[in-house]
């Protein structure tokens, strides 16, 4: 295969990954805009990640379509592509790290007001990438490197210092935070007396699967760069590195939609509306439309509400994100009629009051998962 064929193959992979990421991130942002029940501290971080990824992928796609693969001179499109890759990728990684930290903060450290860190997140997630980008531009090290433009092949020190060094740190720190969070939640679930342990494990998985997607999508980059450092340049790791690193936004978006029934009910109702005009899937469309705002609660007690209502802070539990902040992280997503939903809301309010009294009277750690914690 010639060098030009390699470049064309790289560009094709880039376009496929960029287009899929654009579609996925757009769906998440539309859902965040249209569905107010989705808006909380965690989903805000995810939406900012998606907005950053969308910005990066749109510009990258336009440049890839317009940029000639045989161009050898560094012009404005070349510099813009390098800026988008460096700034956009670093910002997306940092938003993922902030998501890892926020989940750890909520679950393990039991932070009652995670929103107070958001202003620092903004400064960090956009400030550090800006510094790396400015240094890259000021040192005149941008060159065409195959299917895109970036730091030239002869500047390994800059590549590591401005890009891969921060990446390895972010990847490793995210993995550690996921491990600590998983260890904590697993130990609490295992020591509980709940009849819903399977649902609690599903809840735990849905808390951390965003981070797992990040770790998996970028592990190929780590393997490929290690091989490159050993002066090995195999095709398969390079292709996997290119595809999964660029399509990270797509897989993160799919994970978000999977975690939130609001999303697939909302888009499902909109999609089936087309067929219902022709008398097809009418009942299914109506049921989704009626229940599109029914984001089922998690199987775990909402710790923030419990603490706000005076529950003993020494009780060990797996916190959700408060009533206003609850994500749909349940194992079963039952669709109900409006009447059934109203009855269940009244029933849930009664049980929430019962749990509050139960927590005040009993400080046993196993109370977090008693069998009244229903979905």
Curated annotation (Swiss-Prot):
Residues 359-375 have a biased composition (Low complexity). GO terms for biological process: adenylate cyclase-activating G protein-coupled receptor signaling pathway; culmination involved in sorocarp development; negative regulation of gene expression; positive regulation of gene expression; signal transduction. The modification Phosphoserine is found at residues 192, 298, 303. InterPro entries: GCR1-cAMP_receptor (IPR022343), GPCR_2-like_7TM (IPR017981), GPCR_cAMP (IPR000848). The keyword Membrane applies. One of its GO terms (cellular component) is plasma membrane. It is a multi-pass membrane protein. Residues 346-358 have a biased composition (Basic residues). GO terms for molecular function: adenylate cyclase regulator activity; cAMP binding; cAMP receptor activity; G protein-coupled receptor activity. Residues 31-44, 109-119, 181-204, 260-375 are cytoplasmic. C-terminal Ser or Thr residues may be phosphorylated. The keyword Lyase does not apply. SUPFAM superfamilies: Family A G protein-coupled receptor-like. It comes from the Eukaryota. Pfam families: Dicty_CAR. The chain crosses the membrane at residues 11-30, 45-65, 83-108, 120-138, 162-180, 205-223, 235-259. Belongs to the G-protein coupled receptor 5 family. Receptor for cAMP. Coordinates the aggregation of individual cells into a multicellular organism and regulates the expression of a large number of developmentally regulated genes. The activity of this receptor is mediated by G proteins. Plays a key role during tip formation and late development; involved in cAMP-directed patterning of pre stalk cells as they sort before and during tip formation. This is Cyclic AMP receptor 2. The lineage of its organism: Eukaryota, Amoebozoa, Evosea, Eumycetozoa, Dictyostelia. The gene is carB.
């Amino acid at each position: 295969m010639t060098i030009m064929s390699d470049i064309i193959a790289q560009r094709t992979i880039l376009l496929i990954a960029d287009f899929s990421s654009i579609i996925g991130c757009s769906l998440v942002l539309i859902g965040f805009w249209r569905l107010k029940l989705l808006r909380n501290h965690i989903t805000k971080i995810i939406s900012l990640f998606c907005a950053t990824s969308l910005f990066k992928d749109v510009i990258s796609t336009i440049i890839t379509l317009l940029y000639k693969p045989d161009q050898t001179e560094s012009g404005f499109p070349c510099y813009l592509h390098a800026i988008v890759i460096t700034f956009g990728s670093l910002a997306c990684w940092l938003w993922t790290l902030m998501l890892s930290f926020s989940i750890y903060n909520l679950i393990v450290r039991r932070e009652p007001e995670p929103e107070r860190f958001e202003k620092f997140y903004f400064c960090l997630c956009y400030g550090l990438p800006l510094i790396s980008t400015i240094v890259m531009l000021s040192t005149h090290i941008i060159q065409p490197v195959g299917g895109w433009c970036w730091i030239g092949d002869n500047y390994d020190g800059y590549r590591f210092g401005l890009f891969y060094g921060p990446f390895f740190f972010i990847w490793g720190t995210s993995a550690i935070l996921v491990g600590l969070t998983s260890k904590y939640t697993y130990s609490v679930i295992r020591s509980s007396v709940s009849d819903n342990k399977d649902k609690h494990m599903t809840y735990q998985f849905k808390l951390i699967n965003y981070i797992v997607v990040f770790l998996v999508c970028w592990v190929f980059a780590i393997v490929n760069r290690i091989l490159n450092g050993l002066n090995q340049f195999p095709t398969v790791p390079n292709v996997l590195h290119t595809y999964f690193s660029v399509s990270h936004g797509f897989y993160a978006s799919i994970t978000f939609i999977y975690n939130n029934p609001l999303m697939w009910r909302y888009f499902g109702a909109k999609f089936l509306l087309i067929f219902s005009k022709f008398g097809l899937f009418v009942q299914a469309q109506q049921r989704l439309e009626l229940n599109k705002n029914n984001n089922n609660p998690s199987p775990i007690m909402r710790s923030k509400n419990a603490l706000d209502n005076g529950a003993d802070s020494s009780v060990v539990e797996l916190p959700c994100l408060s009533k206003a902040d609850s994500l749909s992280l349940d194992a079963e997503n039952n669709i109900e009629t409006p009447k059934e939903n109203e009855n269940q809301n009244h029933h849930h309010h009664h049980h929430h009051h019962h749990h509050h009294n139960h927590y005040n009277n009993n400080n046993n750690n196993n109370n977090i998962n008693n069998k009244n914690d229903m979905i």
